Amino acid sequence: MGEVVGAAILAHVPTIMLPEATRLDLNEGKEISLVPGLKRFRKEVMETLDYDTIVVLDSHWATTVEFVVTSAAERSGLFTSEELPRGMSQVPYAMKGDPELANAIAKYDEKN
């Protein structure tokens, strides 16, 4: 296992997944402020760090009352959001997992 080289708490809104033209149309021709903020974060932080894994804790995934840690070596499929299906419908995803890291995180589980 390596070390933590960075951490961030980032805001997000489901509309970020809409096409740019749709976002502009919904926001009187202006981009939502989150988009340039995330681009700046990528340039100033993500592109400057030496990392190999990103851990995302998000309240909009399969559960809102607990965190689920999956130890799959790879996950892929099509995602449709329950909150904003018109913006996130059948979005393909394929990403590598890190079973070793997932199991290390799971060791800190609080038993209910």
Question: What kind of feature is each model-predicted range?
Answer:
Residues 2-111:
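A short aromatic-anchored loop/beta-hairpin motif
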